[in-house]
Amino acid sequence: MAGLTLERIAVGALKDIHLDVAPGEIVCLSGPSGSGKSRLLRAVSDLEPHGGTARLGGVEQGAVAGHRWRRSVMMVPAESAWWFDSVGEHLHKPMPEALEALGFSDETASWSVSRLSSGEKQRLALVRTLSREPRALLLDEPTANLDETTTRRLEDWLLPLIRKRRLPVLWVAHGGEQIRRLAGRHFRIEGARLVEEPVRT
């Protein structure tokens, strides 16, 4: 698998962002509300105009059509969109093991999206994304609506998958404990730049 490289990314207040994320590495991002965490992920996924570029292995973001780039470098926003009536219609392929690991039943694929809670949508948005076999993940506070037990359950499912598929991951997180559990490296947004913080103290 390929690593993810950010080269001179500029979006909003952020300027000249350089970052290399190795295959299978989780890099956590944190910072105050409004500092640009989500906008940075949107720039990397080519969902927002920006300066600079991103690379996945030897492929440059601007060298392929946006929809093709986003199939490889997939972003899971904090509030996911749903466009079909049922959960199963959103899955690229059946994901029974993932559903079970996250506490869902076999019938979940037939559930109406309208019955889902915010926490269920967050978990199922991750299942939906992984069903499409991306080559890199951009996660915007994917456990924000989950309690501690459910958060740990999601991490226990997702981290081995990241390692197995060797996915480079940018993960926006606020909680210090979660960052210590997940991150290979941690960067905090301060003004226009990323400042590396110690992961474990």
What is each PLM-predicted segment?
Residues 126:
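Hydrophobic anchor residue at the start of the ABC signature
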Residues 112-116, 120:
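Conserved ABC ATPase signature
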Residues 137-141:
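Catalytic Walker B motif of ABC-type/P-loop ATPase nucleotide-binding domains
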Residues 172-174:
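H-loop/switch region of ABC-family ATPase nucleotide-binding domains
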Residues 45:
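Helix-to-loop junction immediately C-terminal to a conserved catalytic motif
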Residues 72, 79-98:
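Q-loop/switch helix immediately C-terminal to the Walker
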Residues 60-74:
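ABC ATPase NBD coupling module
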